[in-house]
Amino acid sequence: MSQQHDEAVKKCRGRPKTFDRDAALDKALTLFWTHGYEGTSLSDLVAATGAKAPTLYAEFENKEGLFRAAMERYIERFSAERNAALQDESKSVAEAIEGWFRATAACFTNCDTPAGCFFICTSTALSSSSSEIAHMLRQQHDAQQQTLLDFLTARQQRGDIPAQVDILSLARYLACMLQGMSVRAREGAPKADLDNIIDTLMAMWPALTGQCMKQR
């Protein structure tokens, strides 16, 4: 009986641990979000994920590959949830925009995640050696603005926004609002402060859409 027990223990000890990719990505995402790409070392990632360096390399190739996967994880978990507010065609343009910004404020100030926008937070303090990472982040900044532009374009084509409104300028303005909210959240502003910014934006909305006119 004792011999069988010893053999079972040996087999259990020799069995390799299963690598939990999703759990590792969530931990890597938090590290990159908090410290940035260059502020996060491979040893930090190994310690946080509990995986050995060879395991991480086998799964993601290198640190850049892990960052790319973490970025996709962020899009999957947070960006898609926020963008859903723009897809409800039963809402007016103002209601959809407000819903998008409210969801954004909730994401930026969620106590379970680092403050601010992952893309904006990780794009600061990048050196020239991280040009590929910088390029990926610029693409994501552009994608956020494009999401707003696509929404405004569709609503303008539907007749919900006057044809003379310059929706590109409006999308750029809203994207800048997003970046400002991220910075404020990163500085420690509570959700109430971001909600106040959104209140001001929505109070200005009628005038804002009237001012963003196409130049003849």
Regions found by a protein language model. Give the residues of each.
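Hydrophobic alpha-helical segments that form the core
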Residues: A115, I120, A163-R184, I197-M204
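Helix-turn-helix
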Residues: S2, A23, K27, L31-G65, ...
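N-terminal intrinsically disordered/low-complexity leader segments
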Residues: M1-F19, Q211-R216
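Hydrophobic alpha-helical connector segments
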Residues: A69, N83-A115, I167, A171-L174, ...
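Amphipathic C-terminal alpha-helical segment
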Residues: C107-N110, D150, A154, L174-K191, ...
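Recognition helices and adjacent regulatory flanks at domain boundaries
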Residues: P16-T18, L29, W33-H35, S43-A48, ...
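Amphipathic alpha-helical segments used for helix-helix packing
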Residues: E95-I97, N110-H135
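Amphipathic alpha-helical packing segments from all-alpha helical-bundle domains
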Residues: E76-S79, K91, E95-G99, S131-Q157, ...
